């Protein structure tokens, strides 16, 4: 867009979005597409299925933006009001496009459509000069329309698969031709584990003020992301802008950065073990198979992951992992001593290079003064009788799933660090 442009806005229409019944993935996806096109996307709005409210929002947006992209409200039901509201916003009439009705009838050949099927025919109504965006996956077309000079509206249905196809086949080229200035945004995301967002932010304070590239931290459960974004004409130019910042971060946070972009802790660990031609097994208690699932969700995990024992009860710890009743009684299932034995015995019984065992109290019940909710023991048994024991005490205000997920992340990252240390 030109330097004098006002920017782009996204308007998501649907009461179900306001009620939280569905997640608005459309706005996220469109935002990514706009960034790739280098467009200034400043605001997103959501409004329910109420014509007057939709009209008010559209009229407000038309005063401050060049391009409005709407999703939702194009279907045949009474609460699909987007096109009607757009027409009302600019005091114009809607006209039927007969060829669209013919297309709808062809898409629904087995239904008993009548020429007076007004609920479906409303999808054929558009302002006089609007350009139709064909919907090959559904019955609700969209439109490209410039109701006033300098302001364009693109409408899409709320079904993600339909919206994406219409965007890729029609809308993207239109937006690129009319609004893009040949600059695009390119991003590279570094992923951190074993360090909190505040600690990262404190150490990169100088980088947070950069204009091109920009550096922005984001936190997920047990993980921090740093997104480095450059505005450039092509990937090579962007890479040259991003690279110095990326190299500085890798130097300053060498052991904490585990990957980039689509990397995950499970995928990185699988890659590291594959490169070493090593295998791994698990002995899980408090995570109940979540650790195993984190690996098996990744394609190619069978090269390194042999299996696991989910020994939730003391009986199974005894019968499957040979943890003596005396040890269980003396130290308790949630203890370093028992967890270490679980790892050693799992490695021996299941025949792998590495074994990770985990035992803890995920809550919300079951804790005590000596062993509170959030207490987790992790043991890693490796080649040459290598043993690493880890004790973590997660905040007891976290819920059960959060404690389990954080525990899995610690397991994976701890072995990653061991492998990294061994390779030096």
Swiss-Prot record:
Top-level division of the source organism's lineage: Bacteria
Matching InterPro entries: CinA (IPR050101), CinA-like_C (IPR036653), CinA_C (IPR008136), CinA_KH (IPR041424), Competence-induced_CinA (IPR008135), MoaB/Mog-like_dom_sf (IPR036425), MoaB/Mog_dom (IPR001453)
Annotated HAMAP family: CinA_B
Family: Belongs to the CinA family.
Protein's recorded name: CinA-like protein
Organism from which the protein derives: Prochlorococcus marinus (strain AS9601)
Native organism taxonomy: Bacteria, Bacillati, Cyanobacteriota, Cyanophyceae, Synechococcales
């Amino acid at each position: 867009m030109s330097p004098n442009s006002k920017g782009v806005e996204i308007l998501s229409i649907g009461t179900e979005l306001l009620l939280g019944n569905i997640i608005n993935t459309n706005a996220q996806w469109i935002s990514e597409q706009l960034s790739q096109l280098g467009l200034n996307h400043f605001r997103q709005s959501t409004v329910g299925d109420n014509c007057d409210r939709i009209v008010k929002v559209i009229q407000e947006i038309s005063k401050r933006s060049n391009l409005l992209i709407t999703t939702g409200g194009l279907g045949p039901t009474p609460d699909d009001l987007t096109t009607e509201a757009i027409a009302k916003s600019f005091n114009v009439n809607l006209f039927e496009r007969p060829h669209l009705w013919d297309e709808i009838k062809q898409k629904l050949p087995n239904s008993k459509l009548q020429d007076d099927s007004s609920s479906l025919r409303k999808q054929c109504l558009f302002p006089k000069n609007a350009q139709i965006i064909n919907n090959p996956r559904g019955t609700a077309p969209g439109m490209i329309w410039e109701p006033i000079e300098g302001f364009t509206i693109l409408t899409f249905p709320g079904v993600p698969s339909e919206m994406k196809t219409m965007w890729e086949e029609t809308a993207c080229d239109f937006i690129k031709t009319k609004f893009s200035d040949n600059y695009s945004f390119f991003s590279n995301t570094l992923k951190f584990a074993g360090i909190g967002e505040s600690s990262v932010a404190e150490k990169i304070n100088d980088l947070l003020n950069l204009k091109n590239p920009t550096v922005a931290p984001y936190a997920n459960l047990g993980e921090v992301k740093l997104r480095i974004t450059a505005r450039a004409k092509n990937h090579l130019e962007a890479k040259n802008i991003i690279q110095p910042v990326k190299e500085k971060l890798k130097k300053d946070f060498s052991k904490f950065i585990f990957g980039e972009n689509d990397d995950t802790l499970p995928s990185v660990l699988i890659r590291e073990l594959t490169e070493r031609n090593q295998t791994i097994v698990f002995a899980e208690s408090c995570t109940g198979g979540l650790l195993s699932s984190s690996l098996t969700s990744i394609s190619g995990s069978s090269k390194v992951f042999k299996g696991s024992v989910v020994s939730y009860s003391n009986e199974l710890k005894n019968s499957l992992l040979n943890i003596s009743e005396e040890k269980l009684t003396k130290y308790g299932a949630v203890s370093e001593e028992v967890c270490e034995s679980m790892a050693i015995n799992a490695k021996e019984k299941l025949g792998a290079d590495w074994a990770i065992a985990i035992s803890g109290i995920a809550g919300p019940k079951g804790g005590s003064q000596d062993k509170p909710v959030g207490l987790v023991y992790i043991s890693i048994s490796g080649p040459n009788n290598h043993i690493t024991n880890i004790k973590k005490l997660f905040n007891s205000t976290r819920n059960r799933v959060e404690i389990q997920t954080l525990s899995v992340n610690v397991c994976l990252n701890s072995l990653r660090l061991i492998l990294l240390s061994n390779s030096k």
